[in-house]
Curated annotation (Swiss-Prot):
Keywords: ATP-binding, Cytoplasm, Glycolysis, Kinase, Nucleotide-binding, Transferase. It is found in: Cytoplasm. GO terms for biological process: gluconeogenesis; glycolytic process. Belongs to the phosphoglycerate kinase family. ATP binds at residues 330, 355-358. It comes from Archaeoglobus fulgidus (strain ATCC 49558 / DSM 4304 / JCM 9628 / NBRC 100126 / VC-16). Pathway: Carbohydrate degradation; glycolysis; pyruvate from D-glyceraldehyde 3-phosphate: step 2/5. This is Phosphoglycerate kinase. It catalyses: (2R)-3-phosphoglycerate + ATP = (2R)-3-phospho-glyceroyl phosphate + ADP. GO terms for cellular component: cytosol. InterPro entries: Phosphoglycerate_kinase, Phosphoglycerate_kinase_CS, Phosphoglycerate_kinase_N, Phosphoglycerate_kinase_sf. Its EC number is 2.7.2.3. PROSITE patterns: PGLYCERATE_KINASE (PS00111).
Amino acid sequence: MMIDGLPTLDDIPYRGKHVLLRVDINAPIVNSTILDTSRFESHIPTIEALEDSKLVLLAHQSRPGKKDFTSLESHASTLSKLLGKRVEYIDEIFSKGVLRRIKEMENGEVILLENVRFYSEEQLNRSAEEHAECHMVRKLSTAFDLFVNDAFSASHRSHASLVGFVPVLPSVVGRLVENEVTALSKPLKGEGRKIFVLGGAKIKDSVKVLKNVLENNIAEKVVLTGVVANYFLMLKGYDIGEVNRKVVEDNKEDVSDEEMINILKKYSDKIILPIDLGIEKDGVRVDIPLEKFDGKYRIMDIGLETVNQLSEIIPKYDYVVLNGPAGVFEDERFSLGTYEILRAATRAGYSVVGGGHIASAARLFGLSDKFSHISTAGGACIRFLSGEKLVALEVIKEYWAKKWGKS
């Protein structure tokens, strides 16, 4: 069934077919051990849905030059364990041997090919039509009947393995993409009162979401925490001190102060900022009202009064979206803000947690299963909530409308 113009597995016959599935199982790796398998788990519904096909997976790990830029051998064994069936790993992407092995596949077999970023043209930022001409797509596409994109968390990138097959193979999205798009659309399009709680250190990301939900009248309130809140407190004229100013400057990128001051003025009744702060003084946590803060200490969390205020407000909303932690939650002295905001959100109507650090926090505090939806994506989720189009999904819509949906 189509969602918002996106064709899914329900729109195409795949039993007995050769299916090329793009997944995102990019994981934190230390000393060749995969530390977090949550992304692997998120693809299992799609892989299981395709169990009557001849299934080949494409994925990436890290990027060139990074320590964890590795082969996908351990990813294949991790997937095998989770699926309870063999996932064969091949250390190449489109050699003659690979193509021969794919042709010989039986229904129900699963193969994982090598890290697509080992291939030099993968990460070029090109259009689908240009990528369709590259070696990998030209060679591999001959062995498949259809392409499925299930890599929601990478779908904001116009890379070869994400967009290149769409012009040449009938293409749909997998269950994970379907779930993400459905769940993230609800707080943007649903009826009811909405509150967005934006924190973390990536000021530019939060500002993008803030602008979308305020300018398009989506959110009734936007709560700011973390480094983002400190930036807005600075704009309001509070002296947050040299050490905190530096953290803001280091994370601000190209956000315009002037534009943000105007937004603060225009939406002053909708933006909620901290009324007190959690700081570290002589090795212990101290909560200090905004008015009394002299900027001498590093801000580590929102303060206790702010926490109490938010714990009361958040559960009253029909929809709550959380993105980014409220403080340095990895240090238990300063985990209070993030923990209590997460807890309050579980009591709201429909609760969505963005990917990245806030999702890690939800897992750390054992709250993951209490939310309506936890996104697997960081950047792609932010872009979606900012109202931006995700290029790899738009290409699938476009080609379905003009080519594959008609055949």
